[in-house]
């Protein structure tokens, strides 16, 4: 049925943080900070296709999360060096000792004759030349159609994927770039492929990272604006696939890489996940327990690939997410953001109390760099940015030690 798989890896949210306001799922509305008004597309996709309310990540941070998401396991070395990272941070794969010897999902695809394209995953992003940009400057340049002088490239330590790594898609470890620019590039390439009579790769892996947020750093948008940016980008990508000639034989899988040890009333590992295609128009809640290895196993079966290790080999494929009867008539229409995407965090001079403290900590710990700072501290900052002085749900988060 399917010839093409698009696998989108987002950053660090729990189910209750995003979907907790949906009454048809097992959510706790009081824990929801990025609900329908901030993530209208994820909510609409859950209604139009299916809602997964029992889907889990396997790692608490991106160092483990991206390996679980792409390899279906983490190495013993990675487990034993969690939060130490003596040689380098595993997310961008500078340390060869973090690699699973059986490879990652793209190795599996290439080894079995499939075509692959990598959009921003497993790579590092670099500005060309001496000129660097901040988030607002780049956002305004895009709005004014003035990106001709914006030059950049991505690098990867994995020689196998370098020929398939997009150099026009901004690498996924840099939040200075709006996710709209990432969506722009993917949609441009999709339309060019279609116009030229080409074919999409069998496996496409995409990083869409800005729901990670940068805390309350004044050089970046507010947390809710960054999550809204990510949500709109996802909606636009789904629409583009849905309206292309590839719609009938393409399936989109969406997962967070990890939960950032965030709060959730079921589990701090529970997260958002989506399966999108004409065969997923169930319009119901699927409460079967699945996790990242289930998603990988499903992709492997769709592409005719063997499992990479014993963990994905024994994972339950996502059978309950698919119907035998497709709905080819439905065309997804993205919902527009209700939050201005360039709603910036306030500057220090306008702050006091907890807002001032969290402003300073957001800068000190550089939360715009994936998992640079303490997860639980960033969770507290995100909670405060939306909920104000309401008590932080520490007992429902993954961090045991409370930070005053």
What are the language-model segments listed below?
Residues 1-404:
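N-terminal pro-sequences and low-complexity stem/linker regions of secreted or lumenal proteins
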């Amino acid at each position: 049925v399917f010839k093409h798989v698009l696998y989108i890896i987002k950053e660090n949210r729990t189910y209750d943080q995003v979907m907790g306001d949906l009454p048809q799922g097992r959510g706790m509305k009081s824990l929801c900070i990025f609900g329908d008004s901030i993530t209208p597309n994820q909510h609409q996709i859950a209604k139009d296709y299916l809602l997964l309310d029992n889907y889990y990540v396997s790692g608490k941070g991106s160092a483990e999360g991206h390996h679980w998401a792409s390899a279906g396991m983490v190495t013993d070395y990675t487990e034993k060096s969690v939060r130490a990272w003596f040689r380098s941070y595993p997310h961008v794969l500078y340390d060869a000792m973090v690699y699973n010897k059986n490879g990652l999902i793209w190795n599996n695809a290439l080894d079995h004759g499939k075509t692959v394209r990598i959009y921003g995953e497993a790579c590092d992003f670099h500005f060309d030349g001496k000129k660097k940009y901040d988030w607002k400057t780049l956002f305004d340049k895009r709005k004014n159609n003035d990106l001709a002088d914006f030059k950049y490239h991505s690098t990867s330590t994995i020689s196998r994927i370098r020929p398939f790594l997009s150099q026009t898609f901004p690498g996924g470890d840099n939040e200075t770039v709006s996710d709209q620019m990432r969506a722009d590039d993917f949609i441009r390439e999709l339309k060019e492929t279609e116009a030229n009579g080409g074919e999409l790769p069998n496996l496409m892996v995409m990083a869409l990272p800005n729901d990670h947020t940068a805390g309350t750093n004044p050089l970046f948008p507010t947390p809710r604006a960054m999550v809204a940016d990510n949500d709109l980008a996802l909606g636009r990508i789904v629409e583009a696939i849905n309206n292309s000639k590839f719609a009938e034989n393409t399936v989109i899988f969406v997962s967070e890489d990890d939960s950032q040890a965030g709060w959730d009333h079921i589990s701090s590992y529970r997260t958002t996940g989506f399966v999108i295609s004409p065969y997923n128009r169930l319009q119901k809640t699927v409460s079967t327990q699945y996790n990242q290895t289930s998603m990988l196993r499903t992709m492997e079966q769709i592409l005719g690939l063997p499992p990479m290790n014993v963990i994905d080999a024994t994972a339950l494929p996502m059978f309950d997410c698919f119907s035998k009867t497709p709905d080819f008539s439905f065309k997804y229409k993205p919902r527009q953001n209700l939050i201005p995407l360039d709603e910036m965090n306030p500057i220090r001079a306008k702050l006091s109390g907890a807002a001032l403290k969290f402003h300073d900590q957001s800068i000190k710990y550089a939360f715009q760099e994936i998992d640079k700072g303490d997860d639980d501290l960033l969770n507290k900052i995100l909670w405060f940015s939306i909920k104000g002085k309401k008590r932080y749900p520490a007992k429902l988060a993954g961090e045991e030690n409370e930070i005053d």
